[in-house]
């Protein structure tokens, strides 16, 4: 058999296809290593292992580029001297299309030419971790570049015959878990604690620590003596005062590991010494956890044994209701890369959404909470990424069920029982989604009608009393509920061992600060939008769960698994088999995910605009009906945006105004692929080819491949990609421009 000499070399079938299908299917399956010619399980693991190094190299190269351009074309040193008065610069702009007005609009006062403002938050991170000069940034950029080179080499090396790990090495789950827990999380957290204690904290107190003196500068006056004499409390004594001026010794203490809680009033960020303590605690926990599982030494837990015993006995809660419990899951997870990826994506998705929340509510970076545009950009960015990761988790979960699930190995265990109970699971999710949808929309529409008819007092406004109770129990005083931490006489406030000081002293001050973003006061508008978001989350979950649980087969199509993860239909002779592949569920869920995160970010942004401007009444009064959202959030805040350029000139929002329009264009283009069907494109292509072959110059260029329309699934993918990219581009421009126009 001759090997393919043209793309794709990994598939003989596709390489010999005479149509443009060769290109599109080649691109679509380039990363689906499992389906490549001659692929073995061991080779599959080795290729994936090597690609991880390549992936890391790209990430480090990208990070290096960001740091390098800030050092080269940014204004980092001027910004460090005045972080609340100078706008950080990402990089310079060279654009031959810029006229005089544009050059002036995008040039900062005293600047040498047009620049891009930085809304990434990198400046704040650099400042927090103790970098002070462009030289520090150049050193970081070069270090990241060297690291990228090391990882590229490692990727190449692990593809060489002598350095390819064996399949048994990849399947050694306990050893991998130990190393990832202790090494990846534990030791890296310890190293980060070291950096914070030895470099960042001294720099925050005006003492420079660099490569020249970091081995001779004591981070604490007592040195290591308290550590070895177990007198660790010394490291928490004499923390920075509330009057500490960042980057100077004024008001500075000597503590390196504290438990203050709340924020530094000067920087409006978490105390650096609290964060060092946090990372040290994480390091200890994970290094201990990394010694938990049994490997060559014969000590510790066996995950297989733990899972085998995971079955509550009869007479206890759930006893006897779980069948074989978790038996068989060890091999099921360990032998399926898709299952492992699904679990990893689900965890990472949750963590990324938490990052979005904590970046503003418990802001770790000095002075960043005063840069509202950066805060808004980071929240939106992380929330969208969380959505993509979560949908990806379900997609790979469904691929696992189609390709890797073994019914014999999982007989009557929890996984099999989930599949057996799929009707109950899907119908309950469906009921919840319908309930949330009709009730929430009903309340919004009722309130709209009351507004429209001039009787706003007849709106149905429901106070979120349970959520307010939770806020009050954490110490929020505004509701007057006197419960737990908001009641100084409660057990939470007086508990042993230290009567009232058991809670972090700065916490109550932070949670009750009217200018902060921690536990914002909530009312009827919040109640409604929370339920709208719950509708979106439950419907997205319903679509994804149904897609996964029906991926192997349904009453309509019992042999579905034989058709693979994505198929359009089973021919014209079998009615109702279109749009029911697991891929179609992923495709539909993507729209719901984007929609839901739209509501999440609209809500967050509108509420925060009120907090930042000091006018919280606008959100509170106008978020209880739909016209309020359309008029007072979307329309009112896009007014600045669509005026970025006009017949009379332009301003520094012009680039965002253009991006706003361009995003709409990309988004609208998606419908061209989503609505028209394959035959239409085939006829269009045939007409274009006919015209091409009869045009004097064009006919000199001939295709080697016969042009054919994309498959139905590919057309949908292209449509979805345009819809998604356009949607995100449009909202990114809206968030940045509307916030920057109000906050600078």
Swiss-Prot record:
One of its GO terms (biological process) is photosynthesis. It is found in: Cellular thylakoid membrane. One of its GO terms (molecular function) is electron transfer activity. It is an enzyme of class 1 (oxidoreductase). Its EC number is 1.97.1.12. Keywords: 4Fe-4S, Chlorophyll, Chromophore, Electron transport, Iron, Iron-sulfur, Magnesium, Membrane, Metal-binding, Oxidoreductase, Photosynthesis, Photosystem I, Thylakoid, Transmembrane, Transmembrane helix, Transport. It holds the Pfam family PsaA_PsaB. Chlorophyll a B1 binds at residue 664. GO terms for cellular component: photosystem I; plasma membrane-derived thylakoid membrane. PROSITE patterns: PHOTOSYSTEM_I_PSAAB. InterPro entries: PSI_PsaA/B, PSI_PsaA/B_CS, PSI_PsaA/B_sf, PSI_PsaB. It catalyses: reduced [plastocyanin] + hnu + oxidized [2Fe-2S]-[ferredoxin] = oxidized [plastocyanin] + reduced [2Fe-2S]-[ferredoxin]. The chain crosses the membrane at residues 48-71, 137-160, 177-201, 275-293, 337-360, 376-402, 424-446, 527-545, 585-606, 653-675, 717-737. Phylloquinone binds at residue 681. PSI electron transfer chain: 5 chlorophyll a, 1 chlorophyll a', 2 phylloquinones and 3 4Fe-4S clusters. PSI core antenna: 90 chlorophyll a, 22 carotenoids, 3 phospholipids and 1 galactolipid. P700 is a chlorophyll a/chlorophyll a' dimer, A0 is one or more chlorophyll a, A1 is one or both phylloquinones and FX is a shared 4Fe-4S iron-sulfur center. Chlorophyll a B3 binds at residues 672, 680. It is a multi-pass membrane protein. [4Fe-4S] cluster binds at residues 569, 578. Belongs to the PsaA/PsaB family. HAMAP family: PSI_PsaB. The PsaA/B heterodimer binds the P700 chlorophyll special pair and subsequent electron acceptors. PSI consists of a core antenna complex that captures photons, and an electron transfer chain that converts photonic excitation into a charge separation. The cyanobacterial PSI reaction center is composed of one copy each of PsaA,B,C,D,E,F,I,J,K,L,M and X, and forms trimeric complexes. PsaA and PsaB bind P700, the primary electron donor of photosystem I (PSI), as well as the electron acceptors A0, A1 and FX. PSI is a plastocyanin/cytochrome c6-ferredoxin oxidoreductase, converting photonic excitation into a charge separation, which transfers an electron from the donor P700 chlorophyll pair to the spectroscopically characterized acceptors A0, A1, FX, FA and FB in turn. Oxidized P700 is reduced on the lumenal side of the thylakoid membrane by plastocyanin or cytochrome c6. This is Photosystem I P700 chlorophyll a apoprotein A2. It comes from Synechococcus sp. (strain JA-2-3B'a(2-13)).
